[in-house]
Regions:
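Short, Lys/Arg-enriched N-terminal segments with co-localized hydrophobic residues
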Residues: 3-18
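Short, polar/acidic, helix-capping and beta-turn segments at strand->helix junctions
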Residues: 19-166
Length: 166
């Protein structure tokens, strides 16, 4: 049995997906951010066979400013949901860049892992990470339905509220 990890599956070059994901993004009035360069000793994406692994994308607003803070203290569940949604937009931007700006190469999203910077008594991590899951499935439809983990942590890089990888 092959071990699946957080990843997005990409299509063989010869097979094209009939769904126009760029059109869907436009219909949803979404704007993809610029795919960010890594801030450490790692790569933003790695392709292995037909699998695309995307490093953690941190919460940033429309202006590229970090969404910093702790759920259960500075932010509520709805704020976290929106921060996770922003992380997912960055995941899609990274996937698009890795696929030569051709999202039709995406076959499916296999798994997301979301990390929520939260207080000890905050327990809505799954609701927060729904922001990322809902965005991915709204763009990719059934191909965007994925396995998932939503993890609480007491700190995230640069003090951000949410981080999601694929």
């Amino acid at each position: 049995m092959r071990k699946e990890e957080n990843t997005i599956e990409i299509r063989n070059q010869k097979k094209e997906n009939k769904m126009n994901y760029d059109k869907k993004i436009e219909e949803l009035n979404l704007i993809l951010p610029k795919a960010a360069d890594p801030v450490g000793a790692y790569v933003a994406v790695r392709i292995s066979g037909n699998l695309l692994f995307i490093s953690g994308q941190i919460s940033m607003n429309e202006n590229g400013e970090l969404i910093k803070g702790k759920l259960g203290k500075e932010f509520n569940t709805d704020d976290g949901y929106n921060a996770a949604k922003r992380c997912a937009l960055s995941i899609v931007a990274q996937a698009k860049k890795a696929c030569g700006n051709n999202l039709s190469k995406i076959k499916s999203c296999i798994k997301l892992t979301g990390f929520v910077n939260s207080t000890d008594d905050f327990t809505d991590q799954p609701k927060v990470i729904n922001g990322a899951s809902d965005l991915i499935s709204s763009i990719f439809g059934d191909a965007g339905m994925h396995a998932r983990a939503a993890v609480s942590t007491n700190s995230l890089p640069l003090g951000v509220a949410v981080e999601v990888d694929a």
